[in-house]
Regions:
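Positively charged n-region of N-terminal signal peptides that target proteins for export
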Residues: 1-5
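Bacterial N-terminal signal peptides
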Residues: 8-17
Length: 213
């Protein structure tokens, strides 16, 4: 994510392996981790440093330790992660994005975010390849909740600026025979508890050297 008007969630967690249905755990804002889930962020600086690092693509211009801040939740109790790094000021994407230190194949991901100003823009990258858009005010295929540039924005499910939102993403990675892709990546997603993408094939890679998660 970039220096935008976005707070990342109090709790980010992930189930690795087969992508189970939503019936196997809670979904939506304030969901609790399902049994066996790996918590990726719990509101603490310790976990931020333990499990996250900068994505060192060609535009990277920051340096460790991670400059993103732990701040008080602007809505509820607790602490959250603010997506701010001075080098990314002015929307210079790719200069200070974060990625998990671990790599994952098939998984179910829960992430909560809060946009504090109109037009806030970021994104959730899956495997540094595929982007689920986070963009206030945009209802197009490049807009909020879209598999970017491939599906319409499910903007109807968005809670709006100043409120917490949640993506629950079931992701099945692409399959390959050698260098040839044999099966496309597939995503099913719930946005604030509403099912908005169902077994959606992902055709294009939007991540890579210029982008992070």
């Amino acid at each position: 994510m970039f220096h935008k008007t976005l707070f990342s969630s109090i709790c980010v967690f992930l189930l690795v392996g087969f992508c189970h249905s939503s019936a196997d755990g809670q979904i939506g804002v304030n969901a609790k981790p399902a049994e066996g889930a790996e918590v990726l962020f719990d509101g603490t600086r310790e976990m931020l440093d333990q499990k996250w690092t900068y994505w060192k693509g060609p535009r990277f211009s920051s340096s460790l330790p991670v400059k993103w801040k732990i701040v008080q939740d602007p809505v509820d109790r607790g602490t959250v992660m603010m997506t701010y790094d001075p080098v990314a000021a002015g929307g210079k994407y790719g200069t200070a994005d974060l990625v998990t230190k671990m790599k994952y194949e098939d998984f179910r991901l829960h992430v909560e975010f809060l946009i504090v100003k109109k037009g806030g823009n970021s994104g959730v990258y899956l495997q540094n390849r595929y982007e689920i858009q986070v963009l206030d005010g945009d209802k197009t295929k490049h807009g909020m909740g879209a598999v970017i540039n491939e599906t319409p924005s499910p903007y109807f499910a968005y809670n709006g600026v100043g409120k917490w939102n949640a993506y629950d993403i079931n992701f099945r990675a692409a399959r390959f025979n050698g260098d040839q892709r044999s099966e496309k990546a597939i995503v099913t997603m719930f946005f604030n508890g509403k099912k908005v993408h169902t077994n959606q094939s992902i055709n294009q890679v939007w991540g890579g050297p210029n982008s992070g998660i």
